[in-house]
Amino acid sequence: MRALIATVGSEGDVQPFLALGKRLLAEGHDVVFSASDSYTARADAVGVPFVGRPTWNETEFQANYLRIISEKNKLRQLTVVIEFLAQEQRSAVPQLMALAREADVVIHSPLSIGAVAAARAVGTPHVSVHHTWPLRRARGHGPTNVNLGPVGNALAWSITGSGIRLATDKLLNPVVAAAGLPPWRDILFDASHSRLLNLIAISPHALERDPLFGPTYRNTGYWFLDEPGYVPPDDLAAFVADEPPVVIGFGSNNGFDAHAVTKQLLDAVRGLDRRVVLQSGWAGLGDQELPPHVFLADFVPHGWLYARAACVVHHGGAGTTAAAFRAGIPQAIVWLQGDQLHWGRRIAQLGVGPPPRSQHALKAGWLRGALDSLLNNSDMAARARVLGTAIREEDGTGMAVRAIEKMFTAR
């Protein structure tokens, strides 16, 4: 089987797809991976054949991310995202069509509109992949996953769907047209779902399967990209060797006052009898003098760092949350946008962390209390360990490969 994998987004969006590509290759299939050419080195490092797209560099991505975060109106925020996405996806269509013609299946993220258009234009079946619950009209909940009752849910979906469609179809139909197809309606909903197979790359231990999803939706478990060859800097390895540290980092979150946030973080951990690894992230945390028990780090693979940590405070990205689940450590979420609040709430529901906090409301006092729970609540720690054991026993990429193979042979 020849698979084309296409995705968009940041490092956290790309890594799970690289994990799937690596597993497909190990199972004897052919793979071509298409994403921003800024990930060429990452793909080469794990041995996944890669065709880069000249889309954006990290500086451009961060600039657009800041535009998104600065928008207070949620519909306008979505429009900014789609404007950015549509430009990139339209330019990618010729490459994606050429690759899709040579593929037996196209595997894509929900926002890879160009890949879906290319697949449908050339007649190649496509499989959608989700790292949080797919956005779909369901009777059991409204657009924000709150159950408003059958009538309320239907009304909320109608209003929300109309607003999204009016704001985004006009921006995304040029992507569809670039593939030689007539205009689509409701593109964001339509392109993010496959009529054949939709893989939900989440552990059922972390989030139970929605009973309203039909047989074309498969909950596979998480897809982790292990990096056994990672060698940490000597000073970091020595810092974490004596005792498991607290890890604090907000990943690709940006658009807040990093200096002020760093001050709040340092105030919270000043008297803490525990070492702290502070990850600078895209925002550039740690831009001031740090006490001896705080180590400033840049990128460190979650699999390596979290396995050595006591707990983690992070932004609530789906991939970061999954990595902390897998490590079996308590976690607290300081959220900013997207599905981060959802994951923060889910962590609290599972009892492996305190209720989430908004980035804009982050104060040292709250963080001190959160760290006290993370470090000293034995029941919370026990639940996190049990969850971690269950997730480590799963084979998410293996289940995904088997589901794709079954779909392919059944056609």
Where are these regions (language model features)?
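Generic beta-sheet signal
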Residues: 34-36, 53, 109, 129-132, ...
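Short, polar loop motifs at secondary-structure junctions
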Residues: 34-40, 110-114, 203-207, 280-286
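Short gly/pro/ser/thr-enriched loop/turn and capping motifs at secondary-structure boundaries
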Residues: 39-41, 57-61, 128, 133-139, ...
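Phosphate/nucleotide-donor binding subsite
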Residues: 49-103, 158, 172
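Conserved nucleotide-sugar donor-interacting segment of glycosyltransferase catalytic cores
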Residues: 87-156, 205
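Donor-nucleotide binding loops and adjacent catalytic segments primarily
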Residues: 205-311
